[in-house]
């Protein structure tokens, strides 16, 4: 499950498709 691909929660990543705080 790529949280960046799904734009999921990634506060540590930060990156991704608008995935900041799900």
UniProtKB/Swiss-Prot annotation:
Its cofactor is FAD. The keyword Electron transport applies. It is found in: Mitochondrion matrix. The keyword Mitochondrion applies. Keywords: Electron transport, FAD, Flavoprotein, Mitochondrion, Respiratory chain, Transport. It comes from the Eukaryota. Binds 1 FAD per subunit. Residues 1-22 are annotated as: Disordered. GO terms for cellular component: mitochondrial matrix. Accessory subunit of the mitochondrial membrane respiratory chain NADH dehydrogenase (Complex I), that is believed not to be involved in catalysis. Complex I functions in the transfer of electrons from NADH to the respiratory chain. The immediate electron acceptor for the enzyme is believed to be ubiquinone. Belongs to the complex I NDUFA9 subunit family. Complex I is composed of about 45 different subunits. This is NADH dehydrogenase [ubiquinone] 1 alpha subcomplex subunit 9. It comes from Solanum tuberosum.
